[in-house]
């Protein structure tokens, strides 16, 4: 992106446009350094959080970060994380994301993604048992 963006209702302010290319380069350096060290669920959640924090696009950052997260999960044999769209689930998601972005408290976000992957796995098991 070439303009500064703000996220409505969020405390996090994305980096200035001139910083985005370097931030994106750093993101993929981090990915290459950690892809074989972290559990795939943790890796996918970290990439989601890091990409949406950089906010490299004017629009579609959340969708793109969820696609990237789910690609990493699928590449590693896990089901996609289905993030529910109801009000309570969205508030939990935004709260956990904001803690990661503004306080560097990543555990709530990692747990949220892990719980969603687990729920998807349980649904698949329940369907296959029927």
Where are the language model's segments positioned?
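FIC/Doc superfamily catalytic core
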Residues: 1-130
């Amino acid at each position: 992106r070439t303009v500064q963006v703000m996220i409505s209702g969020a405390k996090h302010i994305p980096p200035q446009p001139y910083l985005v290319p370097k931030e994106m380069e750093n993101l993929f350096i981090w990915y290459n350094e950690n892809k074989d060290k972290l559990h795939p669920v943790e890796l996918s959640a970290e990439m989601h959080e890091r990409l949406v924090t950089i906010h490299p696009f004017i629009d579609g950052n959340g969708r793109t970060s969820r696609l990237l997260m789910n690609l990493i999960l699928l590449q590693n044999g896990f089901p996609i994380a289905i993030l529910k769209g109801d009000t309570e689930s969205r508030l939990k998601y935004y709260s956990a994301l904001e803690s990661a972005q503004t306080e560097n408290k990543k555990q709530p976000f990692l747990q949220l993604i892990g719980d969603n992957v687990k729920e998807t796995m349980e649904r698949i098991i329940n369907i296959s048992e029927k």
